[in-house]
Amino acid sequence: MIYEVELSEQADNDLRGIFEYIAFELQSPENASGQLDRLEEQILSLDIMPERYRKYENEPWKSRGLRVLPVDNYVIFYIPDSNKKVVTILRVMYAGRDIENQLKFHTKQSETITSFSANM
């Protein structure tokens, strides 16, 4: 079954921040484009069998169904809803960050969710 993939406002900001950091801080726009392409490709792949990646191991996120998709040095956090056939991308973060602290401040209720397509 094909799922619709949605991107939270925070995840969209995360992707923009990753691109800007690599392109401008590291002065490598080609690498920034390549990294963004790889992240987008993996996000879009979640339209089929999104449960194939592991659940996040810590509560309260584990019981909420949060899953983790590693891509290079980054992790994509998402929740699949099998009833609605929707995958919501919550965060995209550098794997070396304090992930617990970043997730603690994330509240889905305050998020704006948008449909995700390859034409970001």
Where are these regions (language model features)?
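Basic/aromatic recognition patch in beta-strand/loop cores that engages polyanionic ligands
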Residues: 49-83
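Basic, Lys/Arg-enriched alpha-helical interface segments
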Residues: 1-62, 108-120
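Basic side chains
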Residues: 38, 52-54, 67, 91, ...
